[in-house]
Amino acid sequence: MGQSSSTQAESKSESFLAKPSGACCLKGTIHEGESRGTWETIADVETYITRPPEGKENGNILLYFPDVWGMFPNGLLVMDAFADAGYLVLGLDYFRGDPVWKHRKDRHDNRNPDFDYEAWKRKHTAFADKAVPKWVDSVKKSYGTSTSKFACVGYCFGAPYVCNELKGDTVTVGAFAHPAFLKEHHFQDLKKPLFLSCSEIDHTFDVPSRRRALDILQTNKKTFHYQVFSGVEHGFALRGDQNDPYQRWVKEQSLAGIVSWFDYWLSQ
């Protein structure tokens, strides 16, 4: 979706509701499991593609926008889980093989003192802002059919791309979990249903920001569902400790809620 120069200037001057990815985005654990998808270059961006098991296809397509950890094992396994629910899933590596964990393994990792996190974010945001619309168009042309519908999901860094798609015509429904980089216009401009999966503890999308986002959604009569889990932090839907029964349950419930949301709206 393109923006006029005046609209771009206004959006740049807005303050963030969900702040840019910060130190909380560097925390997490790597999950065990073998991903089953394949890789393909689409619109000059490496893309992970995972398909539903035979006989479980629902005919619909899910676009996946990753968090700052990029195409790491947890993300691939989550995409496979969406495929298990019947979706053809495609996720693009807009970090181009340069996820944040290559530079910092966690928020206390200072082994690379020259790493400039702010410059890293600026570099990859600039690329993703241009690459995502082209990539979505290419996916639609290559994989869309006369009967297929599109959904999209984004984690952290990927949240604004979900909102951008939900103001256009390609995607029918969307969802994000523990978002970053969101401003008021992302909520004001929505034309399609949005699922918000959030954590009680989140310095990126804190309580006042969540309340403001909900106020915008309600005032503008948007279609949405708000889910919040107590006792977990930013990153819960992708990077929680799977040896902790509650964190595992939260991750699974977030995904199940998103799938149910997609299934409903894509059946209408």
Specify the residue positions occupied by each region the protein language model found.
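N-terminal cap/leader regions of alpha/beta-hydrolase-fold enzymes
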Residues: 2-268
